[in-house]
Amino acid sequence: MVTQLWESLPPDAIVADAASSTYVDAGRLRPVEFQGDYYRATGVLGVVGGYRGRRPVLLQAGASESSKQFGSKWADALFTSHWMKPSAQEFYSDVKQYAAQKWQRDPERLLVVPGVYPVLGATEAEARARKADLDDQLDLEDMKGSLAELLGVDPAVLDLSRELPYDKIAPSDPADGAGHVRREKVVDSARERGVSIKQVLLEYLTGGHRIVVGTPEQVADDLTDWVDTDACDGFNFNIDRYEDGLEHLVDWLVPELQARGRFRTEYESTTFRGNLGLDGDAGDAA
């Protein structure tokens, strides 16, 4: 329904002819007659958008099977969260295959963009000290409650210095969608790495997005490795601290990526779609 509405006002329908007092050529409109299970729409989009017949970029978030199916069909970019590269590579492979084989899309036109939190320092020791300072400001005992709820266990069985009580965690229901995926990620990642509950909580706070700690060079190495090994196409950057996190990202990490030829030095397009490399895609109305 949404895409039909966006395409109901093609660029050539707007004639803006002052001499004839005609702004829109009604004969060129594409009225919508949509009836779905939950929504219905008729007529033409009532707002003249700046896109002029080019639909905005569609972003989909989620990693459940239903999200992968939906996103690979409709989205231009997929937001996701992965702590471990193998799971990221599996997700990447799945959605690219779905796009190509199930929906006959060019998989290069579907971007996979996981979230990441860079914690930067001029030296590795400085970066780790910054991360430790951020961790010290958290009330981990209070955070145990939400983790216990996610895992379906009593908070009393969560000892910060120990691993998760895997024998007490009941299997989650795939029908729970995002909740199921979140629990599976937490449990599988913690078990694979053998980390403590404290470490799980420090990661859980980021919504499952990966934290990369180090110098600009070290973080750039990590990020380019993920892209080069088909774990993602790029990243949705988050800042670790409001007062200077953005400055570290822009002044330290971006120049390092630019020096490696991995980040633009000027914009290629005047649109968000174009700067994602998606010009000429389905966003251009036929």
Residue ranges and their predicted role:
Residues 57-61, 76-80, 110-117, 227, ...:
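Hydrophobic faces of well-ordered beta-strands that scaffold small-molecule active sites
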Residues 1-53, 86-90, 96-227, 258-286:
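An alpha-helical appendage that flanks or caps ligand/catalytic pockets
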Residues 69-84, 131:
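A conserved active-site cap/scaffold subdomain adjacent to cofactor or substrate pockets
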Residues 2, 58, 71, 127, ...:
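Conserved, mostly hydrophobic/aromatic
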Residues 52-55, 65, 73-74, 107, ...:
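Short, well-ordered loop/turn elements at secondary-structure boundaries
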